[in-house]
């Protein structure tokens, strides 16, 4: 432990040897402690009207030391010695040290003699002990004390500030932002924290120290330059300075707490006063509303009409629904506020609230009772009055409804009975009108009761002195007069309808006879017109001859048809006589048919006109069919020659391609002669095309004189040209293969014989099984075992690379020539490259350009891969992989 430490402060004191070493190693700390401790002492001594200048000199006599302890403790010490001798000074210092010890601080190695002798280290240690005991030890924050408590307080206060991170009492304060943050947290008006910069510690420190000295009564205990110029400021100096801030702000906190307590008491009192004012106003408003409402509810003046009484009832319902509920809520809230106010006053030891006279809760309840009593009587009166008017209005409404129904029923009835629609009606319409009139008479009888009821209700309303009786009487009289008139018109109309019915029944029988005979005759004429105008489509002479015969048969029926026409017109003329004789107004037409005599005559004339037109059309079509028949015969004669000729040539070419007569050159010469003869036949094809064009223009679609169509001829001709060209090409390729591979004519004939032998369908190709049998016949050992199947699959991939499933004769020749001839191999090419390379495993570009033509040398250089062997040189190329790639044994 430090020689001036105590047991109570062992958690924040350094060991003595560390204290000594610190003072010796860092004189800057001693300077900081001198200045800080001196300023701290003077901040208390000035209260006694004195101060110190030199801390180790001014405390030597013990007088100012005792005075300092009295100021900071508030207690009186023993009377000091006033002598100037050393013994007097030691006595005074001991009195001070004894007082410190009496406060529970156990001093170690601090003696009065060292203080009297001006020992700086001991003097600073003693002052630090005093600071710890009287300025820091009592600091407590959340169960932490002394140093930790002070540090926690600093961290709490500076937490919201950027660039401030208080972790200790030395380097955390070097930039000055910590001091500024403490001041701004408690007195934000003193410092504009937003303008401070972390990289300007001198300004920050001087700002904090100057503001603290000027406004917070905290003396300047350190120089900003000393803190900034020290790698680690003295912890005790910083703690002393910070503790001054703590005590300065803790006093302000106490004042704030006292002010808050006063504000709280005043707020409670103001709230109670506001509640009293609210109660008085609410009570006054509610009583005023009750006084205004009661006279309205006591008004019992009745209204003459139901509408007016219903409006009063609606107003009363609005009062119940809209106006009263808020007042009920106000009354309830008034009682709640009164009880709440009395409770708050009682809890806060205030006297009970006494409302103004007439505004007590009981006064309001009495007024409310009067309101509800008036309300109940008003509602009963309204309902009784409404029921009374309702009975009278019901009777009047019943009259109006019955009168309206009767008037609606009679509306248009007089006009209907006066109309003379029967004069232009048909018999069926007359019968319908009679049925309708009978129904009306039944309806008229049924309405007799309603008319009597209307008169009875009107009489009752007169007896009850209904206010609108004059209008009721006038309406009733009008209904009775109209009713008598309807009866007279009804009888008159019945007589007219029955007279007209008898006259029209005779005419109806004639109309029916006319309709029965006119309809089939009209259908016959329409069918005849359709047949005569029908657009016929024929393709043979036989068809046109059949149409001509049918037309002649139709013309033979025309005289009988004309007789039927005249008979039908006679019936219509008889009807016309009856109409003229009895002056019947025939506004309508024949109800049984829409066919008029004019229509019959018009259609008959049309039929007579269409007959010669049909004769001419049939004659022209007969001539056209004769011409078409000549075209058919001409085309058929040529097609029956050309078709077989093409088929014969196809067979001959196929036979030449598989026969083995003569050499390949002889076969090629023979085929070229065939090709020439085929080309010379082209004019006959063109002539046939011309005949086919004429047939198409004549719209001829079939030809019984030949089985060949132009499409068949075209396809056959194109196949013939393609076949001769392909066959010539195959023979030319066989000649090239023979010459390139050195195959003799005998070998070629043998290959052809083998191929033809197994080409049993003469298709010119071999299937896989046919090809396999052919290879076996030529001596290839291809069995059905896995090895044989693999070998055959390899051969098929050579002869059928596109996997078409067939082997042509050319592919067969190529395969057989490779199998029998001496061909180049990859090994031979590699051996040649090795010679050019001077027996090396690689070759260079210069060697290739020297030995090969330029284009072939560049081709090899572009495609050869770089050589990667151990004997490689720059620019070496791999001719071995290139050689195998040429024969498909690897990739280029």
UniProtKB/Swiss-Prot annotation:
The modification N-acetylmethionine is found at residue 1. One of its GO terms (biological process) is actin filament organization. InterPro entries: Actinin_actin-bd_CS, CH_dom, CH_dom_sf, EF-hand-dom_pair, EF-hand_Ca_insen, EF_Hand_1_Ca_BS, EF_hand_dom, Spectrin/alpha-actinin. Residues 1-247 are annotated as: Actin-binding. The modification Phosphoserine is found at residues 6, 471, 677, 890. The keyword DNA-binding does not apply. Keywords: Acetylation, Actin-binding, Calcium, Cell junction, Cell membrane, Cell projection, Cytoplasm, Cytoskeleton, Membrane, Metal-binding, Phosphoprotein, Repeat. Pfam families: CH, EF-hand_6, EFhand_Ca_insen, Spectrin. Spectrin repeats lie at residues 274-384, 394-499, 509-620, 630-733. Homodimer; antiparallel. Interacts with MYOZ2, TTID and LPP. Interacts with DDN. Interacts with PSD. Interacts with MICALL2. Interacts with DNM2 and CTTN. Interacts with PDLIM1. Interacts with PDLIM2. Interacts with PDLIM4 (via PDZ domain). Interacts with IGSF8. F-actin cross-linking protein which is thought to anchor actin to a variety of intracellular structures. Association with IGSF8 regulates the immune synapse formation and is required for efficient T-cell activation. This is Alpha-actinin-1. It comes from Rattus norvegicus (Rat).
